[in-house]
Amino acid sequence: DIPLLYGDFDDRVLGDLASGLAGGPSNAMAVFAVTGADEQAVDAGVSQLSEFLHMLGNPVAVITASGSTSMTRTMNLNYPLGILDMQRALSVCAEDGVAAVIIAMDDRTLAEHALESVNVDLLGTEDVNASASLNELKTRYAFVAEHDMSMTSSTPESDEMAADSPAMYDRVRLGHMSLAIAMVLAAGVRKANIKSALRVSRDLN
């Protein structure tokens, strides 16, 4: 006979189970998320942050409805991602040795509660009015934050540093670069390392 187990099998339990079976992949890498006022802003923010983290020497993965990759590997996923889909994707990233994953936090990419049992380290946006929606995002996508999270956005310091990058001649891209720098600073990367990467990038361009 096959034993039957009874209990309340809600999304939280499913997330814990899926994360456990996958080996807790979100604990094996830095998890960044980008949200914004529209799809284009989110995609651009994800792309710029990915490029900048790679510039700093990090193996990077990107999870977005516009095209998910784990380093150079294309991940063929069906969007919006559910709880099991997300844990499976993160597991692939962890197996590939990714140091940081960037998630597009929007409804195209994520289904409701898709981030159950996913530890998000940093959440960024270029929309300065979006900070009030942090609790709404937590409720909608159910991500875990192990500290008192606040929304990261561009600062005068990140604006100044971005003005020294190859994005200096493109006002729109400059905003994306400033957000990427602000998020990397918030993650604890030293300013000297950031300035050095920006200088090398500028010289190459």
What are these regions (language model features)?
Residues 1-4, 17:
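Acidic-aromatic/histidine active-site loop/patch
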Residues 16-170, 179-187, 191, 201-205:
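Phosphate-binding loop of NTP-binding sites
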